[in-house]
């Protein structure tokens, strides 16, 4: 009689989840343990790099890791799908139906048995229930969101470049508001200016960083609150030297299609 393997299911293939299945696979292998990763994306990219993907400074295809090749190397199995529910009584996770781009079902809803279950689903941006944010704002939570931001940025830059070609005196700008002065917001603001300076070499001859208007809005008294005051102040000064408008002590109360509304009515 074949001995039943101990089944360890890890849901979420972010930095924590993918490192866990790698270590479990390396330590236990496939002989007596069945290690399974459930992840809704096909590739992994380190989340702190998403601002570089969004700004166009990093080609994610060169830095991402494909789960299928990674699982083969490290001794675990990969299930492409999204967690729908957990059946604790029967020791199962239920994966939602897998649909294609047209909404047709590829894989029906199904369950995976577990002896040990690890939820490593990570975090997502909190919109704090602010009206209009879900409808009108972009979030840097994953590779797909970073790609959407980059594509929208390039489209706006192309529009401004074309407008300036037709009318060199046009007051055309790409305006970006970044809500949150933490590490991601600050790094994204700086990277946007670096990327804008390079666009002229990629077909947008009349576009440069002077046509970019970036604002960082932070509700707290200063940006980079996790850092000591001195390096945070230095980063603030560097952003302003690039041309970034840094607003501290400002809380966003609503978002509209082409503007944000602050609590003080600005």
PLM region spans:
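Conserved N-terminal Rossmann-fold NAD(P)-binding element of oxidoreductases
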Residues: 11-12, 119, 179-180
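FAD-binding core/adjacent interface of flavoenzyme oxidoreductases
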Residues: 1-5, 76-177
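A conserved beta-strand/loop element that lines the FAD pocket in flavoprotein oxidoreductases
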Residues: 75-87, 240-255
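Beta1-alpha1 glycine-rich phosphate/pyrophosphate-binding loop at the start
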Residues: 2-85, 183-227
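Predominantly flavin-linked oxidoreductase catalytic cores and closely associated redox partners
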Residues: 135-238, 242, 246-248
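Short, well-ordered coil/turn residues at beta-beta hairpins
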Residues: 96, 120-121, 248-250, 263
């Amino acid at each position: 009689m074949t001995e039943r393997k101990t089944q360890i299911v890890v849901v979420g293939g972010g930095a924590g989840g993918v490192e866990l299945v790698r270590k479990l696979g390396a330590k236990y292998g496939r002989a007596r343990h069945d290690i399974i990763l459930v992840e809704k994306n096909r590739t992994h990219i380190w989340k702190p790099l998403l601002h570089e993907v969004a700004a166009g400074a990093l080609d994610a295809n060169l830095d991402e890791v494909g789960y299928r090749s990674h699982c083969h190397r490290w001794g675990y199995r990969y299930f492409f799908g999204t967690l729908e529910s957990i059946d604790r009584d029967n020791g199962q996770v239920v994966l939602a139906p897998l649909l294609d781009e047209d909404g047709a079902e590829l894989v029906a809803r199904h369950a995976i048995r577990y002896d040990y279950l690890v939820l490593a689903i990570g975090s997502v941006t909190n919109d704090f229930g602010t009206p209009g944010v879900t409808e009108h704002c972009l979030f840097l939570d994953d590779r797909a969101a970073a790609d959407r931001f980059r594509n929208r940025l390039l489209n706006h830059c192309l529009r401004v470049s074309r407008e300036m070609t037709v009318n060199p005196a046009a007051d055309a700008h790409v305006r970006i508001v970044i809500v949150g002065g933490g590490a991601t917001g600050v790094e994204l603001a700086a990277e946007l200016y670096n990327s804008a300076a390079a666009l002229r070499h990629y077909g947008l001859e009349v576009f440069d960083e002077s046509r970019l208007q970036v604002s960082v809005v932070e509700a707290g008294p200063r940006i980079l609150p996790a850092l000591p005051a001195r390096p945070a102040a230095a980063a603030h000064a560097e952003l302003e030297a690039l041309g970034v408008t840094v607003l501290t002590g400002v809380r966003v109360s609503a978002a509209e299609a082409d503007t944000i509304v602050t609590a003080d009515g600005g």
